[in-house]
Amino acid sequence: MIFRSMREAIVTMLAALTTMFCALAIDPESGPAILAVVLCLSLSRSQLDRDLRGRLEAAITLPAVSVASLGVAMLLLHAPWIGAVVFVASMSLSIWLRRFGQLVRRAGSLIALPFVVILTTPYVPTTRISHTMALLLPIIVALLALLWVTVFHLLARRLRWLPQARVLSEVVVSPPRSSSLRPIASTRMAIQMAVALTVAFVVGYVYFSERWAWIVLTTYIVGSGNQGRLDVAYKSVLRILGAGVGTFFALMFTVHARPHDTTTIGWILASVFIGIWLRPLSYAWWALFVTLALALLQGFEGPSAQQVLSLRLEEIVIGAIIGVAAAWLVLPVRSTGVLRLRIADSLAMLANALDPATALRRPEDFLLALDRVERVAPAFRASRLLTGRFRTAHPADWVDALIDCRQHAISLIENGETPGEVRKAIGAARKAMREPEEILRALQNLHRSMTSHV
């Protein structure tokens, strides 16, 4: 995984650098260049460039996001409270859109990163191009980002540097149930984000004056990608640790370098690359290096390095507390519920792959669903380390039991086998998702049935 993520990081950075140089050729100011890099990172992570339909949607969404982010940046500078309202609404909308399927969810994910960067990089009007070109430039940069991300990814896949794009098949496990009293998870997470960001802006504007940005930034990062309240608490710890280390290194570097000189720009780009590369290993790495990049981009102002570091850490801790409080107190999403749903999705994919009636059986869909299970596993494994001695069974054990089935499942699918005993065990495991006490035993039985047929 480490080598694949490194290759993806290299391809993403090549696209980002090419787009950045194109933007600088049009306007030497730093604003469009920063926007170019951010849009490339967002597009690469959304994977909308992987197919024609996604590229068409990105061609519409990216320019809109680009223009909107600059508009919000202007509002935050000249009308802070109005800018805060628009920022909160936009971020919450990007989460609420998850309810409309995979493609819309990926398009909504484009909103986040450009809006995050404007928190630490204030809008500066361009002075080197005409007013008309300044209005068109965000759209031009967005389309350049789409062009170069698509070109580099297509070339990398053609050269077999990256694997062919895979899209998870839509298999309906059980329709989400919603009511006016208990909305579905995406709606609850959107409400949580709206409440958290609103509190962060109010606390920042009222009590911290010019220091509000990092409070809002941390609140968003802790709550983004919410996979349940345990996940938010886990990420808040990683965010504080990673951001603290990142801020420390950024501060030490700026003591010996001038803000925004060539060396600083090189370190910013290197930090972004390493953050993309190591993100699949742990969120802590992403938190560390994205904080380092943003801190170098923003620079430091203060009477002493020690005071700047303590103030920045104070802002990060306050933002993390707000994010965790919203996740646990405002329409909380149970982490075990998220995990059970993702395990059920994986079992549905496995059942489909081992169904004799399925014309084309392949392991990719099951593996992609299993990847989604593994994304929520770190928080549960950390919880198991702390509470393992007090519990005989832990949800992290469910993940381990399912992962133990991976190689056996691949062998059965690739060999075209559909043993009845295994299919029966899969059915029993899917039924056990309704009874947490039975899940571990059912998954262990599934593993034993697979072992006897491989």
Name every feature range the model reports, one short phrase each:
Residues 1-273, 277-288, 301-312, 329-338, ...:
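Alpha-helical transmembrane segments and their membrane-interface boundaries
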Residues 223-226, 296-300, 376, 380:
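A short secondary-structure junction motif
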Residues 322:
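Conserved catalytic alpha/beta cores of large enzymes that bind or transform nucleotide phosphates
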Residues 290-293:
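Membrane-spanning alpha-helical segments of multipass transporters and channels
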Residues 281, 297-304, 354, 433, ...:
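Conserved NTP-handling cores and scaffolds of large molecular machines
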Residues 1, 125-136, 151-176, 326-454:
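Intracellular, membrane-proximal regulatory regions of polytopic membrane proteins
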